[in-house]
Amino acid sequence: MRKLIYFSIIFFCFSCDNKKEPIPSYYQELEDLREINDQLIKSNSKDLSSIYQLGISIKNQSLNLYVRYHKNFNDEENEFLLQCAATGSEAAQKYKDAVDYFLKAQRKFPESDNAPVYLHNRARILDNILMDKNNARLAFEELIELYPNHPLSENSKVYLDNVFGKSNEEILNILK
């Protein structure tokens, strides 16, 4: 009986391994991406070279993680990856890519609190940077239609009615 008790104690001690499960490497990669994204947010807006490099890094890392591990991540994490792809593309001056990723983020997560922001950023880039006025108008109108009560929709209505497509001279005359 004594041997059985000793055997049970030894068995219990060895079976109670207090080792923690290792965190999968893709979660560490996601945390690394969060840190780089925070660097971009905190960066000096006049340091264009640094912003460009951070943008390239964020875009590449987020897309790499999304393509390889999107099934392992929850919706919030996948949305973050698409958001990073979009903002990284914009910071890296890859504006057509940014427009596409903002649209993809909104389409994949239309109920997200950030969905109207994605559409607004898409419209802003189309309008002010790519100078694609037709698609910019459509993007603003889509924002207004899908999220009519959001403050960005209200701003977009005012913008389309009063400023969109007008020259600087026409805008100055409106302000007088």
Model-identified regions with their sequence ranges:
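Terminal, low-structured helical/coil segments at or just beyond the last alpha-helical repeat
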Residues: 137-138, 142-176
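Bacterial signal peptide processing site
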Residues: 17-19
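Structural motif corresponding to the intra-repeat A-B loop/turn of tetratricopeptide repeats
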Residues: 92, 129-130
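Short solvent-exposed coil/turn linkers within tandem alpha-helical repeat scaffolds
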Residues: 67-78, 107-115, 130, 144-156
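C-terminal motif of bacterial Sec signal peptides marking the signal peptidase cleavage site
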Residues: 12-15
